[in-house]
Amino acid sequence: MKRILSLLLAIVCCHGIPAQTIDLGRTEPLSPYVFGHNLEHTRGAISGGLSAQMLLNRKFAGKPSRNGGVAADWEGIGDKVFFTLGAPAYTKHICLPNMRRRNELNSQTVQNLVDGQTAGILQKGLYLSEGCEYILRTVTRTSAPVTLTVSLTDRSGEKVYAVHTLSLAPSEDWAENEFRMTPAGSDDEASVRYTFTQRAELTIGALSMMPSENFHGMRPDVVACLKEIGPRLIRWPGGNFAGEYRWKDGLLPVDMRGPQQSASEIHTHPFTHGYDYHEIDTDSFIALCREVGAEPMLTVNMAWNSPEESAQWVEYCNGPADSEYGRIRASRGHEEPYGVRFWCIGNEMGYGHMEGPNGAEGYATLARKHVDAMLEKDLQLDLFSSGPYPNDTWAGKSAAVLADKVKYVSLHHYADAGKHFTDPESTKASYVAITESFTSFVERAERMRRSLDATGEKLHISFDEWNQWYSWFRPSSVAEGIFVARSLHFFMTRSNDLDMPIVCYFQPVAEGAIIITPKGCRLSANGQVYALMKAHQDGRLCKIGDNDDYSTVATRKDKELTITLINHSYDQSREFSFLLKGKVREAVLYSSEEVAPHSFFGSSPLEVTATRKNISTVLPPHSVALLKVDLNF
């Protein structure tokens, strides 16, 4: 008999689940960008997250303390000392003078009114590691000669771990000093103190402290965790923060870049008093993408950037070294163009919380100006429009209007479910609600597809924000890990028929997939699922029958078959049986006894029963598994 090229694998599942088939001969491409992520400068993702910067409010943004004159996160030292916050500022902005923001550009002034008195400022709550070398920088100017003492101490100041002194001469110019300190002890609640005893007025423009071991100002351990989850696309700098971001400020030295105030500061920057301190610029973001193997996706500040400024950003990234902004890039050590292909024209325009036009027609009119200017610099861009999708009005009056040049339309959605874990009944109900809430993504994506198709234009869906709502304000759990697994299975399974090649999780760093403390970081249950499922990347997606619950995904790379399985049941095991001629090369189980917050998956070998033509396994409740099968055996 002629060999049948289309080999079928039967998967038989218990508990009434119908038999499934995996068709190895009928495969289709799997977009690598289904494994996309966001990196937005919000909440704890940068400050206290990816950034290696240890000092809070190091550029003294915002208002001073009541009757004290000291910037937030700092304390004054000395009894008869006069503290003021304001001009003259060392930090600055290059452009966007029309942006309505306040209190971004300050310096901290310390007037010591009594000669011989110790005056200065301190910050508490730092984590010091014995023997670790730290790089510190000060930007100051003074009215009289000053000996500035920088001390690393315990919280009270009684125990001193390291000291460095600087001799500062009076000048109207800013003095920039960099030095290194290595503490003689470890401390979870250390302080850094900047003091002097001379009667003088010392103005501090910026301060900095970070471990000397860093990756472009980022924590290497966090970068390693990000690499572990396998992002193939990273969207930056937002999200909502795209409406605050001044890309040209990134051309300034990092200490000189003005803080950036958020329009919706309580939501986006609640832990940093409404400000971002611009620790990561375009060059460092591109370096991060290259380190972790991701394509960059940039979002322009459509509300406050002019079309020309958006085009200049494109030229900075993609222009030849002899172009105006390509020359600037080359002067910063990056001769070759970055080749940034993906560009979002604003974020969530039309929802009301973003500044700029909030109507479909007004957005389309302004977006067209940015698009035309950007394409003059690079015709090969893939552009993304935004709006309150799915929305038929916006589809017709915005997405369709821009469709000749903008082929992708952004879709954002956050699932929500009650979370109560204090008794067995509420724990089970919450688990079921969380793990089933991924179906809202199915409904939204299908509605979006119908809405875009109704315009008659060929438009792709970019589902570039998704997660559980407010996941960034609470600890993760195995329940959310199963939710992420089911969501990823849906996105992989339906990416082609919904024409949805781009999907970006929001967001991994300190807000879902990577848990970060001053001492270290680790993957959450969500991150563990991503690390497991990245095995599907670069494979071809196999067609699977009777897979309505998205329990199974299979991809093929030549003679290797990768299968991931999900048992989303709260309290029932699930059996999978494969009629398959092959050898199991790898079988891993991610399981846990707990599903409540603070729970993680444990990794163990998956028990597999193999005969000549059959492979079977049983997954315990709320678990995920990976099998790799050698089809050439």
What are these regions (language model features)?
Residues 208-216, 263-278, 298-304, 346-364, ...:
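The substrate-binding groove and active-site-proximal loops of carbohydrate-active enzymes
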Residues 190-194, 359-481:
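Noncatalytic carbohydrate-binding groove/subsite architecture in carbohydrate-active enzymes
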